[in-house]
From Swiss-Prot:
GO terms for cellular component: cytoplasm. This is N-acetyl-gamma-glutamyl-phosphate reductase. Pathway: Amino-acid biosynthesis; L-arginine biosynthesis; N(2)-acetyl-L-ornithine from L-glutamate: step 3/4. It comes from Pseudoalteromonas atlantica (strain T6c / ATCC BAA-1087). It comes from the Bacteria. One of its GO terms (molecular function) is NAD binding. Pfam families: Semialdhyde_dh, Semialdhyde_dhC_1. It is found in: Cytoplasm. It is an enzyme of class 1 (oxidoreductase). Keywords: Amino-acid biosynthesis, Arginine biosynthesis, Cytoplasm, NADP, Oxidoreductase.
């Protein structure tokens, strides 16, 4: 079994990761860590997240400097479900040994260090680790992931958006001079577990935020290879992302070309499902899937694509497991999709 630990295990994403690794046929969940200052330190994970009660009885161990320096050679896999700054500070130590590090923060997703000052609010000083890091969009960068020591797991909005747009861009269907327009709504769990007025039950209302300045915009643009207009919204539901994307296509594009682009991109990727109707969040919440559907207006030359994911799974934890599967030579869906043969 492959020895695995999770740092930042008390949050929503960390708990989902623990659940997935606990049930995985090849990875073994050896330890769960939280900040030494965490109010959940020394509690059992199942006591913090009731749906795991009686399933995962591991304690949430306070992370000390001694433990931090030992993990790189004690573990085979380290998942970081930590704030950006913590991942940034700890990465050189955690990646210094045999362990492969899968970082679910945004600290190593982009190569331009200035982006972190502009969008994340901190100066990036880990140039060597940043150079090493590979972007973990599992259904697109599998070959890079297979040999990487540091994998930067994509953000939730970029996962939903890129899954819809990359087939079109790679097939050359998007018209030059026109920016794809992404409108996406996320559940409140995307804001994390920490209490805040803006995500409290009585305060949440459907609202745009981070308009023309959200940190996921440069991430989407960088890995799509073209600029986009991205507007995120906070919805009054727990989890899931629904992105509706409008794209101007080239004059000669027909429905067959669009269908071929998506089929070619995802024919061997069972995590991504091309639907025959508009996706809804109920179809993907609690699953590792990304559901896609589209409609083309040939007269106006516009294509509308909808992408639906669970922000905590395909947008975070299950995609991290996909990346770990690929890194250790397994099918990306191992432990995530249970195929039943008749």
């Amino acid at each position: 079994m492959i020895k695995t630990c999770i740092v930042g295990a008390s949050g929503y994403t960390g708990a989902e990761l623990a659940s997935l690794i606990h049930r995985h046929p090849r990875f073994e969940l050896n330890a769960l860590y939280v900040s030494a200052k965490s109010q959940d330190a020394d509690k059992k994970l199942g006591d913090v997240h009731g749906y795991l009660f009686g399933q995962i009885n591991l304690p949430l161990i306070p992370l000390t400097d001694d433990v931090l320096h030992s993990l790189s050679n004690e573990m085979d896999v380290i998942f970081l479900a930590t704030p950006h700054e913590a991942s940034h500070d700890w990465m050189p130590v955690l990646s210094s040994g045999k362990a492969k590090v899968f970082d679910l923060s945004g600290a190593f997703r982009l190569k331009d260090q200035q982006v972190f000052a502009d969008y994340y609010g901190f100066a990036h000083e880990q140039a060597a680790s940043l150079k090493q890091a590979v972007y973990g969009l599992a259904d697109w960068f599998a070959e890079d992931i297979k040999s990487a020591d540091i994998i930067a797991v994509p953000g939730c909005y970029p996962t939903a958006s890129l899954s819809a747009l990359k087939p079109l861009h790679e097939a050359g269907l998007i018209a030059d001079g026109h920016l794809p327009i992404i409108n996406a709504v996320s559940g409140v769990s995307g804001a994390g577990r920490k209490a805040a007025m803006g995500s409290s039950f009585c305060e949440v209302s459907l609202q745009a935020y981070g308009v023309l300045g959200h940190r996921h915009q440069p991430e989407i643009s960088a890995y799509l290879g073209r600029e986009v207009i991205f507007t995120p919204h906070l919805g009054n539901f727990k989890r899931g992302i629904l992105a509706t994307i409008t794209v101007k296509v080239n004059a000669d594009v027909d429905a067959g070309a669009v269908a071929n682009a998506f089929s070619h991109a995802y024919q061997n990727h069972p995590i991504v499902r091309i639907r025959d109707t508009w996706p809804k969040l109920d179809d993907v919440v609690g699953t590792p899937h990304c559901d896609l559907f589209w409609k083309l207006d040939t007269q106006k030359g516009y294509l509308v694509v909808t992408s639906a994911i669970d922000n905590l799974l395909k947008g975070a934890a299950s995609q991290a497991v996909q990346c770990a599967n690929l890194r250790f030579g397994f099918a990306s869906q191992l432990g995530l999709v249970h195929e039943v043969s008749a």
